[in-house]
């Protein structure tokens, strides 16, 4: 005799958060955009490499713009209205990613540069000679 099968939910329901934090990590080789809620739980992320850019194309401003648009597009449908932006790193995609976030329609409360700067800490590695 067959037992009635239990319904197993494979995925939790997506969280709805009206306010979030957008972290942009722009290195010289790639740009990673992570969207979290105010407690720090990751809701969405995207990078230039995950958007299909490979090699030297990952470090372009257009790749950073595409990564930012991909990370934010799902969350706007879920009801996110307001965001804080934290930008880290010296890469070429930081300005373009910020421009894409502004054009997405989210209300940006503030933009903060959280790039780590040493107060004369460790000695830097030697300069490359090419």
Swiss-Prot record:
Compartments (UniProt record): Plastid, Chloroplast
GO cellular component: chloroplast; ribonucleoprotein complex; ribosome
Keyword hit for Ribonucleoprotein: yes
Keywords recorded for this protein, A-Z: Chloroplast, Plastid, Ribonucleoprotein, Ribosomal protein, RNA-binding, rRNA-binding
Record-linked Pfam families: Ribosomal_S11 (PF00411)
Recorded GO MF terms: rRNA binding; structural constituent of ribosome
Disulfide bonds listed in the record: none
Gene3D superfamilies the UniProt entry points to: Ribosomal protein S11
SUPFAM superfamilies: Translational machinery components (SSF53137)
GO process terms (BP): translation
Record HAMAP family: Ribosomal_uS11
Family: Belongs to the universal ribosomal protein uS11 family.
Subunit structure: Part of the 30S ribosomal subunit.
PANTHER family on file: 40S RIBOSOMAL PROTEIN S14/30S RIBOSOMAL PROTEIN S11
Name under which the protein is recorded: Small ribosomal subunit protein uS11c
Annotated organism of origin: Staurastrum punctulatum (Green alga)
Phylogenetic placement of the source organism: Eukaryota, Viridiplantae, Streptophyta, Zygnematophyceae, Zygnematophycidae
């Amino acid at each position: 005799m067959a037992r009635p099968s239990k319904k197993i939910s494979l995925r939790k329901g997506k969280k709805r958060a009206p306010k979030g934090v957008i972290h942009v990590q722009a290195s010289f080789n790639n740009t990673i955009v992570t969207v979290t809620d105010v407690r720090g739980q990751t809701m969405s992320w995207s990078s230039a490499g995950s958007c299909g850019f490979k090699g030297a194309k990952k470090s372009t401003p257009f790749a950073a713009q595409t990564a930012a648009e991909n990370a934010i597009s799902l969350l706007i449908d879920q009801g996110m209205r307001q965001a804080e932006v934290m930008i880290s790193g010296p890469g070429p995609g930081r300005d373009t990613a910020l421009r894409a976030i502004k054009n997405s329609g989210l209300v940006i409360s503030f933009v903060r540069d959280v790039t780590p700067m040493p107060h004369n800490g460790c000695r830097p590695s030697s300069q490359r000679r090419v």
